[in-house]
Amino acid sequence: MDEGLSEAVKEIFISLYEQDYIYKGTRMVNWDTQLKSAVSDLEVSSSTENGKLWSIKYKTELDDYIVIATTRPETLLGDTAVAVNPDDKRYSHLIGKKVEVPIVNRMVEVIADDYVDPEFGSGCVKITPAHDFNDYEIGLRHDLDFVRCIDFEGKIESKDFIPNNLHGLDRFKARKEIINQLDNENLIHSIDDHEIQIPRGDRSKTILEPMVSEQWFVKTKELAKKAIDVVENDEIKYIPKAWEKTYFEWMYNIQDWCISRQQWWGHRIPAWYDSEGNHYVGRDELEVRSKNNLSDKMELTQDEDVLDTWFSSALWPFSTLGWPNDKKDLQKYYPTSLLVTGFDIIFFWVARMIMMGIFTMNEIPFKDILIHGLVRDSQGRKMSKSLGNTLDPLELSKKHGADALRFSLIEKANPGQDVPFDEEWTVAAKKFGNKVWNAAKFVHLYTDELDSYELTEIKCSENHWIINRFNQTLEDFNSLMITYKISDAYKTLYNFLWADLFDWYFEFAKTLISNDSSKEETQKTIKHIFLKCLTMLNPAMPHLTEEIWSSFNKENLIDLSWPEFINTNHDEDNYVEHLKEIISSIRNFRLTYSIKNSTTISLFSVKIQEDWFTTQLSSLVNAQIEDINGLNNEESTTIFQSGKFKFEVVASEYFDKEKEVNRLENKIKQLQKSLDVSKSRLENENFMKNAKQELIDLERNNLDSFSEEISNLEIALNSLKR
């Protein structure tokens, strides 16, 4: 409804009208009696429901009767014919004869039409051209009268030919009255259970009423042809490709688009009427008068209807970029490369954007269309108010942050697959955001003294390692994004940031920065890589990354180029991986035997050439490196080894061996009991049959966790018993 977008809507409407794509006509439409507005075919949600099939007797002029089957007896008030199949010999003698419509006592003709299915019901159908889409077409073919018996509020018309007791009744209450009256007159032949397709409005959920109404329409056949061609020629691609079939099915069967709505809010139709009902289209009343040479004395009234929401939405790719006035952004960003959307609005929005983009710009609006699934609840059920499982994204954003919600959905959503959303994902994403925020503080703390952070020569193995890990992450990320595996791409970035950069490299960096010879190189490496990662993270966490970026730089992060690889020539990355493995083993050693971090551990080893290796080891696990020759060969040791690096520790120096053996044995017994309980539950048929899936999954996770912990403790126990 912004001024610029409103102007774009007017321009497109006028352009379509002047090129004979928009017209005003009387046609059958889906009418929402609650919204009191026409709705387009695509806003109709049809479902199969249990209903009734009434077979009703219609008297013939031959003093006999025929049986008519209908699911909507209330519409017989508007019947203007009875139809049979021309090949149905049972009724050939009645074609051209008259029958009497019950209750209204209207004499109508029996007509022959191929539409009638001889196998359905009695093979005779009532024709109500004013209240049924198929009957409407039959009415046009046979030049029948269109008699409206239901008004725009869904009530029976107060007309002379309709009995007074039905005037103003709701259509469904009238149905009951009509059935009772038919039954009293012995005109009900039979009533059978029958499955019916019920059309409801997408928004109101009200059963829609087919109504003949004067509305504005867009001719779509020619527009659709061009929109079909660009997809068939691979100018526009659907991902997954299977959605092209859905697109083509809709487009090849497209009908003229009803674009007028009888609502208060929306873009008002730029058309004016004179006292005789003639309409004039223009940007405003002054233009209408000038263009059509209308006198200032002639009274004009603007159309009170507004345009379908999807009409203005169809202009989104170019109207939001300044069209038709400011075209600077339009020239830069149109067409865009990718549209990400849900399958449920492929025709509502996607197809119409393609049609309007080609019509207006003579160019496709986007090149690729990535279709994601529906967001469901954690159990995979569709969200609905009746189930009480709906989640308000605004409330989630207020509670956890918009970036946390955005990242959690991006990380979990795969193309074409539904997302069983769990709020815990957003909680985890919020923690990740906090981790990034704290990482920014770390980077500021250690790098703010730098005048420049451009990398030159890299000497430290730890810095080479993190640069190579970044390059590999960037390569993997780019490859995944190119193929639109966006979820996998951000999982890759998440793992690099949390595990490699924050958990490992930042710890290495503290040691390096404490040494003057490696300080500046490490400071530059930290800042260089962290800021590149912010750029990669920006599409998934725009608010957080822009805020952090602004604390380092003046320009907007979103305007920057995508990160490039960092040049490095170093092949000692595996040494850092060996270092990580040994550090992890020693930390597990402390944890297993309850050795405090403040306790210095003596590690015995042969002379290691890589001083940086032992420096990091000493710093990160509070270890003192000793010469292996100082180790008593008779003492039992625990060995930590990875690649060529080997360290031994005399475990008994740090705890009472006998007490530790008893502690481990008792711990294993406790865990074994817990494991047996989980195993018993999972082997219980009643539990597996009746328990909720999340409880079953929890028990399976417990079983795996207990098994792994027991295995680790048994290894430690056997080591002590050697």
PLM regions: where:
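NTP-handling and nucleic-acid-processing catalytic cores
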Residues: M1-E153, K159, N180, I228-S260, ...
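Acidic, turn-prone loop/beta-hairpin segments
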Residues: V29, T33, V39-S45, Y273, ...
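Conserved phosphate-binding loops in nucleotide/dinucleotide-binding enzymes
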Residues: S47, I127-A130, F172, E209, ...
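Glycine- and acidic
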Residues: E119-V125, K159-N164, E232-K245, T301, ...
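Alpha-helical recognition segments enriched in aromatics with Gly/Pro capping
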Residues: H142-G154, Q262-G266, P270-Q417
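Catalytic adenosine-cofactor/nucleotide-binding cores of aminoacyl-tRNA synthetases and other
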Residues: D202-S204, V375-Q379, M383-K459, N553, ...
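C-terminal low-complexity, glycine/proline- and small-hydrophobic-enriched intrinsically disordered tails
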Residues: V427, S550, E555-R722
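Core structural elements
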Residues: K431-H444, N463-Q472, K491-T511, S678, ...
